[in-house]
Amino acid sequence: MKRNSLILIGLTLGLNAFAQSNEPTDRPGRLKKDISYLASDELKGRQTGSPEEAMSANYIANEFTKAKLIPQTQTFEIIQLRMATNKCILGVSAPGMDTVVRKFVLFKDYYPISQSSNTDSVRAEWYDCGYGLVSEKLKRDDYGTVNISGKIAVIRLGYPGMEENPHSELAEVADIQTKISEVLKRGAVGIIFIKPYEKFIAPSGNLKRNEKTLNVPIFFCNQTYTFPQAPITMSSKIRVFKADAHNVYAYRNNHKKNTIVICAHHDHIGINEYENSRYTGSPEIHNGADDNASGVAAMLEMARTLKGKKYKKNNYLFVAFSGEELGLLGSKHFVQNAPTFLNNTSQKLGKINYVINIDMLGRIDTTKKVLTLNGVGTSPEFEKSIALITTDTNQLKITTTKSGLGPSDHASFYLENIPVVHFFSGQHEDYHKPSDDEALINYQGMANSLSVLEQLIVLNNKKGKLPFTKTQDAQMGRTKFKVTLGVMPDYSFNGKGMRIDGVSDGKPAQKAGLQKGDIITKLGDIDVNGVEDYMVGLGKLSPEKPTNVVIIRGAETLTIPVSFQ
């Protein structure tokens, strides 16, 4: 659902609530005013699709208006929750009869898993597919010449001998997604997974709201029941709860050919409704001061100040996205449904010169004083310009990475062949925790960083539309990770390897003994020279197969086994 209009979200936050007479006159003061509101308990963490996210959008619209811009909203629909209902059925017919003679009990005996269709039902004969393993490399095919088209596939999880040999090469083809793909290629109309042994960890019954669903019912059955040679009935009835989320944008039209997009996401993770938190305690508001009230405040500051003659070589589009924390939903929707003034006659989004994404700018470390600019490899002009930027190195040092991909909204534009730069002050221990509060923001560090942003624009003013370059790790953004290690990379680290900037409680890294400051040099079979290599290595791991991580800790090189079970 798409709707572009003057923002009317049904709230009563009038302009009088933010009277011009109370506006701070200094940049750090204006940044503090914005962050103090957006990261207040009143907004309850700005969860995408929540009333408080709408309040955030309304505040941003009001600030655009005060900057003499016309705010627009773009509303899009998100899935908040998927929940199996009591209309789900798993049952067995008597041989030769249509009547279901045994019904399994939902959540006691079975449940749908995330990949299952929301609505499909089927009644069919079943076939025992064993472990459902197919590997050309290992010369194994559990299906052989058997035709399972039109049948329900019953498949054991894992692989044979898994308890005794967790490092078997069979683990490479034993994950659930691979098994599903293999059985659907063969025409199965339903899938039932069962445990190979009692202690095997079952797949989660918590349905992922953003999982790509398939057009067949897919269940896990936790009973050691032997199905008779009779038809099985499967009916997947999953209720889907939806809500509206809000992108907000405003356009400064300087009547030029090209437009610079300056963006930030305004959503955060609420009270951890979607389990995105790194915090393991009882529910608390995650205010998201750095992530990303800081980015929104910086974007609003640019909307107020990019007015002078030296900035009029381009038009500007200021955008606050929602749904970033749920998978870049808002920016993906925006590039698919962009305002027509961004298109030229030959290319969708063709009038966009480049994109500056501001995500987590509020925690410039007072010791390191590092500002990271990600994506500078997406145009040859960026590195040339950055080399000419002047900063007091006692106040701010600039480090760069080349990749246009990453877990933030600039990636959505990069994948449309648009140059991007991501302004980032670095990871910290408060990331995705309730402790990411306004009191910890470094406002002078933010102001210094915005001076860099302004210089970047001016230095590129005479170059016209910047050429685009695809970075070498272009496929990395499409990697689907089956596991998480639970570490935060230190993006300011320029040495060989990937230095850990934080370790999440209860995750595999912590359980294995990895520590902040460790430098990962090898993950599984992949040598790690930087964050990009680490991501490639992570994408090759599966939950069923432990791996080794080689690290440098002080003067020692250690090999540490890690399990994902």
Give the positions of each predicted feature:
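Soluble metallo-hydrolase cores and metallopeptidase-like ectodomains found primarily
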Residues: 23, 95, 109-141, 145, ...
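N-terminal capping segment at the start of a domain
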Residues: 26-51, 67, 72-75, 198-199, ...
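Noncatalytic luminal/extracellular "stalk/propeptide" segments of secretory-pathway proteins
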Residues: 33, 41-164
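Metal-dependent peptidase/peptidase-like ectodomains
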Residues: 119, 255, 311, 321-422, ...
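His/Asp/Glu-rich mid-to-C-terminal helical/loop segments that flank catalytic regions of hydrolases
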Residues: 297, 304, 308, 429-475
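PDZ-domain C-terminal substructure recognizer with occasional recognition of PDZ-binding tails
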Residues: 521, 536-565
